[in-house]
Design a protein with these regions (language model features):
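Serine-hydrolase-like catalytic core of hydrolytic proteins
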Residues: 1-156, 173, 189-224, 275, ...
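Hydrophobic, repeat-rich solenoid/adaptor surfaces of innate immune receptors and signaling proteins
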Residues: 11, 355-356
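Short, internal active-site loops enriched in acidic
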Residues: 13-15, 100-103, 164-166, 304-308, ...
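Short, solvent-exposed turn/loop segments enriched in Gly/Ser/Thr/Pro and often Arg
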Residues: 45-48, 97-101, 301-309, 367-373
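Substrate-gating cap/lid region and adjacent catalytic-acid/histidine neighborhood
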Residues: 161, 165-342, 351, 358
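Mature extracytoplasmic/periplasmic domains
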Residues: 362-390
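Tryptophan-rich aromatic "cage" segments
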Residues: 385-407
Length: 407
């Protein structure tokens, strides 16, 4: 009823390998009802069915076989343009948003020429595609896979005689093809260049953008008791963050211990690892978007720690999703029963909806959220308190950047 509403198109996680838009946590009912938006969830071809690059070895017949998983997303966005008015949506106010692999999808779609004009805002949550898969890497993976199947380049039609189970079993059952590259391939056509390297994509220069991450992304991976011994922590910092330089690893550990004196070893490691991966990627996307000098971008950081498992998982990968969708009751196994979660869910879901409505996430129930600049790195912190902070991890960010430059 009334005026056409902003449209929010959700792209699920799973790293282009697995997942679905139908998970209960992604139910858009409350987001649509409370924030007066239309929510669309998308499922598409994944894994080897969505990202097997046959264009180079297969000739003309297979020329458009590349990136069909992402082509599905473009088709879905075109469907939204053609049909969303029938559902009360505004085709001129479409925002794509996604988490993990879904953040990779939104950031890569910004670099797809055929997607230009199909959306007007983009949000990447704990995921990004700064660089795509090169055609050489994709071709090498296909060759290993076809060799395992005993199929030659001029016999690609034989693939269509196989069952999906045979295709998957061969892929995952053969060490020779483990690590098969899955995701957007730089084919020179559908995706002409690396999405965000060396600069933000020009096709979406006028599209407002938001990106962020959670504080301890990997907290969902480690098994109980979620702890590391001192020697394990030193080894983790040395091999993963310090280019095998033990002195640098010790200096990083000291840096994080001084900032978080009450944190266990495991939580310190998870915080540093997330700073060096998902958080760095979100900051980098915002930097590149800012340097483009067109539409604004906004940086956030989710650092509310779940009480589940005695707070030992921290602010882990996927934890922000029920707050964005205002589904904290549906996801009580993730969020626990803290009453504050309702307040945080309101603030976050309203910010995401405000961004979809106007390209600006600000609303009356939160502090002023300034657009990103490289001078101040303004960041909206969603934690036990919602607050706007300039460059909250500056010291750690610069220390990790210095190590990166040595690699």
């Amino acid at each position: 009823n009334g005026d056409p509403k902003p449209v929010m198109v959700w792209m699920h996680g799973g790293g282009h390998r697995y997942g679905s838009g139908n998970y209960l946590m992604y139910d858009g009912t409350l987001l649509a009802k409370k924030e007066d938006v239309v929510v669309v969830s998308v499922s598409h071809r994944l894994n080897i069915f969505g990202y097997m690059h046959l264009a180079d070895i297969g000739g003309d017949k297979w020329a458009e076989s590349t990136n069909v998983g992402t082509q599905d997303l473009v088709a879905a966005l075109q469907w939204v343009q053609d049909n969303i008015e029938e559902f009360g949506g505004d085709p001129d106010r479409v925002t794509i948003f996604g988490q993990s692999g879904g953040g990779g999808k939104t950031s890569s779609l910004m670099a797809v020429p055929s997607a230009a004009g199909l959306f007007h805002g983009a949000i990447a949550q704990s995921g990004s595609t700064i660089r795509g898969i090169t055609s050489d890497t994709a071709n090498a993976g296909v060759e290993r896979y076809l060799n395992k199947l005993g199929i030659k380049a001029n016999q690609l039609d034989r693939l269509q005689a196989l069952t999906p189970q045979q295709i998957e079993t061969t892929l995952y059952g053969a060490p020779a093809v483990q690590g098969f590259p899955m995701g957007p391939v730089i084919d020179g056509n559908f995706i002409p260049r690396h999405p965000w390297d060396p600069s933000a994509p020009s096709y979406s220069s006028e599209v407002p953008f938001m990106a962020g991450s959670t504080e301890t992304e990997g907290g969902w991976i480690g098994p109980p008791p979620y702890e590391l011994a001192d020697v394990d922590m030193l080894e983790s910092f040395r091999t993963a963050l310090s280019n095998n330089n033990e002195q640098q690893a010790k200096e990083l550990i000291s840096l994080y211990q001084s900032k978080f004196p009450d944190r266990r070893n495991q939580m310190l490691w998870l915080t540093a690892a997330a700073d060096n991966s998902a958080r760095w990627n979100a900051q980098e996307l915002n930097r590149l978007k800012y340097e483009q000098g067109s539409a604004p971008s906004y940086l956030y950081f989710f650092n509310w720690h779940s009480p589940v498992h005695d707070y030992r998982m921290g602010s882990y990968h996927t934890l922000e999703i029920p707050f964005v969708f205002n589904n904290v009751d549906v996801a009580a196994s993730m969020t626990g029963a803290d009453s504050y979660r309702y307040e945080l869910a309101h603030v976050m879901s309203a910010a995401w909806a405000a961004f979809a409505r106007t390209g600006d996430p600000n609303h009356v129930d939160m502090p002023t959220w300034a657009p990103f600049t490289t001078e101040n790195y303004p960041t909206m912190m969603f934690g036990d308190e919602v607050m706007a902070v300039n460059d909250p991890n500056r010291v750690e960010r610069l220390a990790l950047a210095a190590i990166r430059q040595q690699a």
